[in-house]
C-alpha cells in the first residue's frame, strides 16, 4: 500500500516541530499538505505517492544543474568513498578556495562554512571586530539567515532601531541593527549622515529573493558603496542566492559593485551543506588563527560537500551556460506574462539569470511595501492549481523561483500550457 503525503505529514508532526525542518516547507503560507519527495532527476522530482512535478524551487536555489546531475553524483560518490569528514585541511578545500577567488575578484581570502546563516553571522562578527563598531544596517524584506542580529524588523521610523522579529532574540541585540527600506537612497543617506561613525557594516542582497524577487537599483547599490567607503564601514553583499546563479561573476559582476565582504552559499555546495564568506585581505586576516575574531566549524570544508561544489562550479563555467540559463528563465517569465494577459489576469514577472519572480500585481515590485500589496490569495490559488497540473512553484508568494540547466523547451512549454489552463479559470 502506497503511503501518502498526508500520512507522512501527520507522523512528522509527532517528532519534528510543525512536521518540517524549515518553516516554509510546512505550506503554512499557501495552505494544504506539504509534499514529501523521494527522488529527483533533471528538472523533475517525484513524491512518495509516485506523482511527478516540474521543479521550480531547486532545493531553494542550489540545484543549478538540476536534480542528481550524473557528474555531481559521481564526484560525491568518489569523495565519500575516501572518507566523509576529516576535520583537517584537504587539497580539495584549497582548490575550491582558489577557484572562488579566481572567479570573484573581490575575494582575496575566503573561509568555508556549512550554511548561509553561518556565513552571514560570521561576516557580521568580522565586520564588528574589524571596525570596532556595533551598529549594522539591513533592509526590510532581505533575509540573511537566522542569526539573532539579523532577525530584526523595522521600527516605527526610518532611523528607529530594530525590534526582534522572532521570540528569543534579545532586544539589546536587535537594537544594534538598523532596518531601512530596500532601494531607498534617501533613507540610507539620512542614516549615514546621523550615525555613520557608528556603523560597522551594511548587509544587502543585490537581488532580494525572500520578498519574492526584487532587484536593487544601480543607484541604490552605488550609494551604499560610496557611503560605506566615506564612513569606513564595510559593504557586505549577501550572494547566497545570487552567487553563480545570476552569472559567473555573480550579482556584483552584473552591477559592477566591489563589496568589502561577500557571502556565498547554495550553488557553491552543489546541493550539499556548504557556504563561504570572503573579501578584502586586511579584513579577512582579522579571523582566527591570524587575528582576534573567532570563527570555527567542525564540518567546515567537508570533503563531500566540496566535491559537489567543485563539480558544480566546473559545469557553470562552460561557455554559454548562463546565456542559455537566462534564455530559458526569460522564456518562462515572458510566457507566463503572456498567458496571464491573454486570460485577463493581473500578473507580472521578471528574471535575473536563473532566478525569477512572479507577482499577482500589474508591475514587478521594487520594495517590500509593494510586494506586500500583491494579491496573495490569487497566488495561493495559482500555486495549488499548478500543483495539480504537476508544476511545483515555491509554496509562498514571498519566495523567488529557480530554473536549472536541466530545464529545456519541453519543461517550459508544459508549464506554460498548464498556466494557460489555470489562468483561464481566473486564478
UniProtKB/Swiss-Prot annotation:
Source organism superkingdom: Bacteria
Compartment(s): Cytoplasm
Modified residues (N6-(pyridoxal phosphate)lysine): 266
GO terms of molecular function: glutamate-1-semialdehyde 2,1-aminomutase activity; pyridoxal phosphate binding; transaminase activity
Any single biological process term in GO: protoporphyrinogen IX biosynthetic process
UniProt-listed PROSITE patterns: AA_TRANSFER_CLASS_3
Name assigned to this protein: Glutamate-1-semialdehyde 2,1-aminomutase
Organism, as annotated: Nitrosomonas eutropha (strain DSM 101675 / C91 / Nm57)
Chain's gene name: hemL
Amino acid at each position: 500500500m502506497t503511503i501518502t503525503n498526508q500520512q507522512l505529514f501527520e507522523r512528522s508532526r509527532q517528532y519534528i516541530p510543525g512536521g518540517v525542518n524549515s518553516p516554509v516547507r510546512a505550506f503554512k503560507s499557501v495552505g494544504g499538505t506539504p509534499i514529501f519527495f523521494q527522488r529527483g532527476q533533471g528538472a523533475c522530482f517525484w513524491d512518495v505517492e509516485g506523482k511527478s512535478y516540474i521543479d521550480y524551487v531547486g532545493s531553494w536555489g542550489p540545484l543549478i544543474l538540476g536534480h542528481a546531475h550524473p557528474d555531481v553524483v559521481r564526484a560525491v560518490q568518489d569523495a565519500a568513498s575516501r572518507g566523509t569528514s576529516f576535520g583537517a585541511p584537504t587539497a580539495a578545500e584549497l582548490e575550491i578556495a582558489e577557484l572562488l577567488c579566481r572567479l570573484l575578484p573581490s575575494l582575496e581570502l575566503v573561509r568555508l562554512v556549512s550554511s548561509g546563516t553561518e556565513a552571514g553571522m560570521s561576516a557580521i562578527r568580522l565586520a564588528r571586530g574589524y571596525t570596532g563598531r556595533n551598529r549594522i544596517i539591513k533592509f526590510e524584506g532581505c533575509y540573511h539567515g537566522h542569526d539573532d542580529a539579523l532577525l530584526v524588523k523595522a521600527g516605527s521610523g526610518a532611523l528607529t532601531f530594530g525590534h526582534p522579529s522572532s521570540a528569543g532574540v534579545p532586544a539589546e541585540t536587535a537594537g544594534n541593527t538598523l532596518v531601512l527600506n530596500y532601494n531607498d537612497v534617501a533613507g540610507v543617506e539620512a542614516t549615514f549622515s546621523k550615525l555613520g561613525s557608528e556603523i560597522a557594516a551594511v548587509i544587502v542582497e543585490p537581488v532580494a529573493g525572500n520578498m519574492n524577487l526584487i532587484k536593487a537599483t544601480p543607484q541604490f547599490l552605488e550609494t551604499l558603496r560610496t557611503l560605506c567607503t566615506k564612513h569606513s564601514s564595510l559593504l557586505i553583499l549577501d550572494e547566497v542566492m545570487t552567487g553563480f546563479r545570476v552569472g559567473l561573476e555573480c550579482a556584483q559582476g552584473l552591477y559592477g559593485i566591489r563589496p568589502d565582504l561577500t557571502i556565498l552559499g547554495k550553488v557553491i555546495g552543489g546541493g550539499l551543506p556548504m557556504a563561504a564568506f570572503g573579501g578584502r585581505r586586511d579584513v579577512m586576516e582579522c579571523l582566527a588563527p591570524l587575528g582576534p575574531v573567532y570563527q570555527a566549524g567542525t564540518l567546515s570544508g567537508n570533503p563531500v560537500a566540496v566535491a559537489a561544489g567543485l563539480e558544480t562550479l566546473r559545469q557553470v563555467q562552460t561557455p554559454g551556460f548562463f546565456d542559455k540559463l537566462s534564455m530559458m528563465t526569460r522564456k518562462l517569465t515572458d510566457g507566463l506574462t503572456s498567458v496571464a494577459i491573454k486570460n485577463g489576469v493581473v500578473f507580472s514577472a521578471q528574471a535575473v539569470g536563473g532566478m525569477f519572480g512572479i507577482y499577482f500585481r500589474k508591475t514587478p515590485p521594487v520594495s517590500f511595501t509593494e510586494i506586500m500589496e500583491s494579491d496573495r490569495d490569487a497566488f495561493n490559488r495559482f500555486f495549488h492549481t499548478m500543483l495539480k497540473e504537476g508544476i511545483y512553484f515555491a509554496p509562498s508568494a514571498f519566495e523567488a523561483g529557480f530554473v536549472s540547466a536541466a530545464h529545456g523547451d519541453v519543461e517550459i512549454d508544459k508549464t506554460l500550457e498548464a498556466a494557460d489552463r489555470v489562468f483561464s479559470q481566473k486564478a
